[in-house]
């Protein structure tokens, strides 16, 4: 058995991405058990906090996706309980989860981002949808990508190639949040680059190239086996391979992330990477991207997860340690 002690994987929750989170949690828990770690999977429901306070684990691996999970809320609670946990701080999580804020920060250090505009639902309703959407098309051009300003798993996302489809795409997007981010569509190769840091600084894992059968890497394409073809490492030339790794590590640093992250990019025909978003709780399901990168790097998911938990415990000790014994 591991000397780590009992750990908890947090999964589930109440967001639209609950099912994905549960699948991620089961996958990581299985991997940890495979390397001798005692692990419980806990759902983030109303009984979570009393349970954590009463039976304190040595550390927590949060795998909650979407609101409350990736927006820093639950991580803030873990800090209040003085429980060591894997991943970004509450503040950094909020920054990465808010796509417009993350875009602005990475653009400020010279990373390429698609042209975009944030449109609140209230503005969409009150100022007239037709006029606003016409102005967006005139400014950015077609095709457009419509996505919730906060959220993941491509829920509420759409590629709009015909302006007549834009109103419906906006309505669908607003079902997942108050603000929509409308971006110019970048033609190229879609890749995801995972970054891990087990104590020696952030390192990019091999990039995953994503080729969905239906043309868009939507929720179904992400989590249904056989719906998407993946190439690991991505079929990029050496210069582009180096460039996407550099962008992912720089984004990880600029956004203040730690331990693990995943950056989604498009590499255009000239080999230039365009930043789309960064994720503080990358999916860990059987079709998710980070586990594929881990295998391609010659690593073991259980060993990596265990090392990240050890790092969280050491970090906690450096700042005063947990309140009370770990059970």
Q: Whereabouts are the PLM-identified features?
A:
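Active-site nucleotide/adenylate-binding loops and adjacent lid/helix of ATP-dependent enzymes
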Residues: 1-11, 54, 95-189
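Hydrophobic beta-strand scaffold residues
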Residues: 39, 84-85, 113, 144, ...
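A short glycine-rich, hydrophobically flanked beta-strand micro-motif that places a catalytic Asp/Glu
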Residues: 40-45, 184, 192, 256-270
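Short, flexible, mixed-charge acidic loops at enzyme active sites
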Residues: 73-80, 217-224, 280
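Phosphate-binding site of ATP-dependent enzymes
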Residues: 158-246, 267, 272-274
